[in-house]
From Swiss-Prot:
Gene Ontology annotations for the cellular component aspect, listed alphabetically: ribonucleoprotein complex; ribosome
GO MF annotations, alphabetized: rRNA binding; structural constituent of ribosome
Top-level taxon in the UniProt lineage: Bacteria
Keywords carried by this UniProt record: Ribonucleoprotein, Ribosomal protein, RNA-binding, rRNA-binding
rRNA-binding recorded as keyword: yes
Protein name, per record: Large ribosomal subunit protein bL20
Database matches in InterPro entries: Ribosomal_bL20, RIBOSOMAL_L20_CS, Ribosomal_protein_bL20_C
Function: Binds directly to 23S ribosomal RNA and is necessary for the in vitro assembly process of the 50S ribosomal subunit. It is not involved in the protein synthesizing functions of that subunit.
Pfam families noted in UniProt: Ribosomal_L20
Family assignment from sequence similarity: Belongs to the bacterial ribosomal protein bL20 family.
Record-linked PANTHER family: 39S RIBOSOMAL PROTEIN L20
C-alpha cells in the first residue's frame, strides 16, 4: 500500500484556520492548536449571540416605549393593551422609533390607547 503524505492538505487546513483567527490576541492568532480552539469558540459565541441579539433589541424597544408612555401618564402594559383594543397594528420596533424621534405622534398614539381603554 502506498504511503499517504498529507503535508499539502494539512498546510491548507492550518492556513484556513489561521486566516479565520487573524486579529486575535497573542498565540490565538499564531499557534494553530490555540487558534483552532479560539475559532471554534468564536463560532459558538456567534451562534448564541445571533439569537440573543433579537431578544436584546426587543428588550431595548420595550424599555424605550415604557419610558415614553410613562411620560404621558400610562404604563407600558396598559399602552400596548389600549393599542390592541384600538386595533393599531404597529410593532415595537416602530413604536420605539416614534417614541424617540416623533414625540407628537407618540402622544397621539397614547391618547388613542387611553380612549380605547376608557
Amino acid at each position: 500500500m502506498a504511503r499517504v503524505k498529507r503535508g499539502v492538505i494539512a498546510r491548507t487546513r492550518h492556513k484556513k484556520i489561521l486566516k479565520q483567527a487573524k486579529g486575535y490576541y497573542g498565540a490565538r492568532s499564531r499557534v494553530y492548536r490555540v487558534a483552532f480552539q479560539a475559532v471554534i469558540k468564536a463560532g459558538q459565541y456567534a451562534y448564541r449571540d445571533r439569537r440573543q441579539r433579537k431578544r436584546q433589541f426587543r428588550q431595548l424597544w420595550i424599555a424605550r416605549i415604557n419610558a415614553a408612555a410613562r411620560q404621558n401618564g400610562i404604563s407600558y402594559s396598559k399602552f400596548i393593551n389600549g393599542l390592541k383594543k384600538a386595533s393599531v397594528e404597529i410593532d415595537r420596533k416602530i413604536l420605539a422609533d416614534i417614541a424617540v424621534f416623533d414625540k407628537v405622534a407618540f402622544t397621539a398614539l397614547v391618547e388613542k390607547a387611553k380612549a380605547a381603554l376608557a
